[in-house]
């Protein structure tokens, strides 16, 4: 994680682990946090509540993002918003990378 970024290629940060999802904290500021989550097909992050809002931006792959009772089938360039306090989860059908822009916490 860095406090200040001028520029970097996010593709260079994408990595996968067959044993568990990979999460990289890219940036943490007083206004937002940026995280990169990389999952192999079948590595689900089960729906769970979180106290902060997040904007998911799908970079690569296909899967389903759950927010509350809604399920969204997503592919690259899809954007999903999960409000503060909502239940959210990720279920990739293929290898998948997602950029999350989070409310600071």
How would you name each of these model-derived features?
Residues 19-20, 33-50:
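Conserved short histidine dyad/triad with adjacent acidic residue
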Residues 52-64, 68:
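Glycine- and acidic-residue-biased ligand/ion/polar-headgroup-sensing regions
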Residues 69-84:
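Short acidic-glycine-tyrosine-enriched beta hairpin
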Residues 1-31, 66:
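A short, N-terminal "cap"/entry segment at the start of jelly-roll beta-barrel domains
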Residues 84-105:
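Ligand-binding loop in jelly-roll beta-barrel domains
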Residues 59-60, 75-76, 94:
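A cytosolic small-molecule/anion-sensing beta-strand core signal
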């Amino acid at each position: 994680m860095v406090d200040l970024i001028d520029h970097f290629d996010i593709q260079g940060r994408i990595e996968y682990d067959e044993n568990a999802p990979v999460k990289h904290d890219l940036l943490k500021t007083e206004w937002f946090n940026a995280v990169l989550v990389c999952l192999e097909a079948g590595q689900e992050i089960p729906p769970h509540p979180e106290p902060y809002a997040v904007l998911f931006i799908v970079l690569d792959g296909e899967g389903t993002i759950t927010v509350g009772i809604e399920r969204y089938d997503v592919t690259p360039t899809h954007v999903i918003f999960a409000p503060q306090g909502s239940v959210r989860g990720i279920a990739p059908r293929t290898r998948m990378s997602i950029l999350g822009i989070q409310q600071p916490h």
